[in-house]
């Protein structure tokens, strides 16, 4: 069903609107669905990074005021082609990672074990759970409590590499804890000095 004239937004137009929470939003229209009254705006990045943008989905039923700042009348550029196989592969990978994470939680793996698994998986994709054990490249098995000395396998480069990753992971975790403790103590020191 086509939208009646005057009740739609052209892709590429600049639009400003006020939400029901009195927030002013402004950006370029990237999509508009007339039936659901949903508007997608491309706005400057909230992170401030150049060459990045935020895409906001706005339900126009909750907008009190809409103003078209610059209406685009020419035909919008053609949509970019999508690499469907790449998207499917990424979705499959994400699903596998979430299932692996869910398995670890249901198996009662400690938070430290889950974090170590994620650290290893960033470097070596070929790692999986086998009950509560982490199996890396079908060669190295890490058993609870997941320390360097819990890495077992045939002596060689794979075992050595995994041990280095585990060692670095726990060094980084310890550094993070020290940093958090010092940040937590800073307000206490300032309060003691000001009294």
From Swiss-Prot:
Keyword annotations: Acetylation, Cytoplasm, Phosphoprotein
Residue segments, region Required for NAADP and TPCN2 binding: 4-67
InterPro entries: AD, Lsm12-like, LSM12_ABD, LSM12_LSM, Sm
Phosphothreonine: modified positions: 75
Residue ranges of domain Sm in the record: 2-72
Positions where N-acetylalanine occurs in the chain: 2
Database matches in PROSITE patterns: AD (PS52001), SM (PS52002)
GO CC entries: cytoplasm
AD domain segment(s): 80-174
Transmembrane segments: none
Localization of this protein: Cytoplasm
MF-aspect GO terms: RNA binding
Function text: Nicotinic acid adenine dinucleotide phosphate (NAADP) binding protein. Confers NAADP sensitivity to the two pore channel complex (TPCs) by acting as TPC accessory protein necessary for NAADP-evoked Ca(2+) release.
Family membership: Belongs to the LSM12 family.
Quaternary structure (record): Found in a complex with LSM12, TPCN1 and TPCN2. Interacts with TPCN2.
Protein's name in the database: Protein LSM12
Organism: Homo sapiens (Human)
Gene: LSM12
